[in-house]
Structures are given as structure tokens and as C-alpha cells.
Amino acid sequence: MQKPFATQPELFVTTRELDHRALHALDDTEAVLDWSKIELILSSIYASKTGRPSYPLLTLFRGLLLGVWYRLSDVQLSQCLYRDLLFRKFCHLELGGDVPEASTLGRFRNQLVEHDLWERLLGEINRQLDAKNIILTEGRINIIDATPVEAAQSGS
């Protein structure tokens, strides 16, 4: 007969895994965007003082951005936020903390659309990226070097 654990089992995630290079894939994206400008736009949304405490608006918006960049439905995005440490890190969600449900993400997007902020926010993101000649592909940065180079004239 097998004995039960005498000691507490190790968690499935250790400090080493939390610093794995795969969890830094969105760090460049994080660094190039001026999030204070995004927060300023988001701050115009009324936050109710009643009911359950809400998620930070920037956390929800970061989640919606991941949904756009990775072409995820709200249900898929919520599932990724539960299981993907990279997504949790980008959205500033704690490892053991709650994660927004698909309905929360959808209601938040609808609220942004109703307040004419969704297109404005995406436009601000695109403006910042364009100013730095950056194209995002599935959350990864591609820097476009558009330096003009004079070529020698060809011909005889």
C-alpha cells in the first residue's frame, strides 16, 4: 500500500520557469508602447463604485489587444489568459489571481465601442507603432528600415 505524501508537493511552476525566455516574447511590444497615453484615453470610462471590484481598465485593454493580435475570440482569449503565462504577464495578471471571463471581455469591448474609444485606442497604438516604423505580427515586433539608399545608375 502506497503512503500519502509526507511533505507538501511542489507547485507546477518554479521560479526558473517564470523567468524562461519564452515569457519575454512580448517584452519588446511592452517597451515600445507609451501605455500612459492609453491609460489617459481609458480613464474617460466611468468606473462604478458599486458591485464587485473591476479589473484594471488597462489590464482588460491589454487582453483585448492580445485577442486582436492573435485573432482570438473572447472565449479563446479568456482560456489563454487562464493557461498562458505569457498572456498573464502581458496583462499584469497575478499567477494565482482571477482572470476575466469571456463575457467580461466582450462587455468591456462593447463599452469601449459605445464610448467611441475602441477605434481611438487602436488608432493610438497604430500611431505609436508607425512613428517608430514598427509592424506587429501576432504580438511580435518587426522593425522596418526605410533608409533611402542611392543606387548607381545602370546602363551602358
Identify the meaning behind each predicted range.
Residues E30, V68-W69, G97, N110-E114:
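Amphipathic alpha-helical interaction elements
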Residues K49-T50, L93-L95:
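Short, surface-exposed loop/turn segments at secondary-structure junctions
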Residues K3, I45, R62-G63, D74-L77, ...:
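Structured catalytic/translocation cores of nucleotide/phosphate-coupled proteins
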